[in-house]
């Protein structure tokens, strides 16, 4: 940690930012885990709201700079493809 007041302030700010990013990352991973569990169990009714929740969390994390924008787009695409593959229905889900 720095000696000057500004260095201490920057350190404190980076700690707060790191914790916020950690919480957002953890929330997104938890959502993904719940969604994957619902899809693998074949529960169609609960997996669609979980997918929407996951997409919302990922977009928020990307907007805040926790995840890279294209990495989030790739993850969302894979999750939607998984849903459409498992529950192959005439309606295609795009989020």
Curated annotation (Swiss-Prot):
GO biological process: translation
Sequence segments annotated as region (Disordered): 1-25
Keywords, ordered alphabetically: Ribonucleoprotein, Ribosomal protein, RNA-binding, rRNA-binding
Matches recorded under SUPFAM superfamilies: Ribosomal protein S20
Matches recorded under Gene3D superfamilies: Ribosomal protein S20
Molecular-function annotations in GO: rRNA binding; structural constituent of ribosome
Record-level GO cellular component terms: ribonucleoprotein complex; ribosome
InterPro entries: Ribosomal_bS20, Ribosomal_bS20_sf
Biased composition range(s): Basic residues: 1-11
Function of the protein: Binds directly to 16S ribosomal RNA.
HAMAP family: Ribosomal_bS20 (MF_00500)
Family label: Belongs to the bacterial ribosomal protein bS20 family.
Record-given protein name: Small ribosomal subunit protein bS20
Gene name in the database record: rpsT
